Amino acid sequence: MDNREKSRLLWKCRRGMLELDLVLQKFIANEIDRLTENQLKAFDNLLTHNDPNLYAWLMGHEEPEKELLEIVSFIRNCD
């Protein structure tokens, strides 16, 4: 992944909720270089969803769509 793409994903991690900012920015800072191409695509797709859904999925209050389940589980388990 080139620096431009990394910068784009880092920018997309900046959300309107502090809680999401903390989780997403920590995740991407620690894991970006280890994610597979499919995981990067799933993460990029995840970031297209609205903050209330992201928060509910990442906090385990609701289950995400099937195609996002793997990346959401991965983010939940990264600490």
From Swiss-Prot:
<dbReference type="GO" id="GO:0006105">
    <property type="term" value="P:succinate metabolic process"/>
</dbReference>
<dbReference type="InterPro" id="IPR050531">
    <property type="entry name" value="SdhE_FAD_assembly_factor"/>
</dbReference>
<comment type="function">
    <text>An FAD assembly protein, which accelerates covalent attachment of the cofactor into other proteins. Plays an essential role in the assembly of succinate dehydrogenase (SDH, respiratory complex II), an enzyme complex that is a component of both the tricarboxylic acid cycle and the electron transport chain, and which couples the oxidation of succinate to fumarate with the reduction of ubiquinone (coenzyme Q) to ubiquinol. Required for flavinylation (covalent attachment of FAD) of the flavoprotein subunit SdhA of SDH and other flavinylated proteins as well.</text>
</comment>
<keyword id="KW-0143">Chaperone</keyword>
<protein>
    <recommendedName>
        <fullName>FAD assembly factor SdhE</fullName>
    </recommendedName>
</protein>
<dbReference type="InterPro" id="IPR036714">
    <property type="entry name" value="SDH_sf"/>
</dbReference>
<keyword id="KW-0963">Cytoplasm</keyword>
<dbReference type="InterPro" id="IPR005631">
    <property type="entry name" value="SDH"/>
</dbReference>
<comment type="similarity">
    <text>Belongs to the SdhE FAD assembly factor family.</text>
</comment>
<dbReference type="GO" id="GO:0005737">
    <property type="term" value="C:cytoplasm"/>
</dbReference>
<dbReference type="Pfam" id="PF03937">
    <property type="entry name" value="Sdh5"/>
</dbReference>
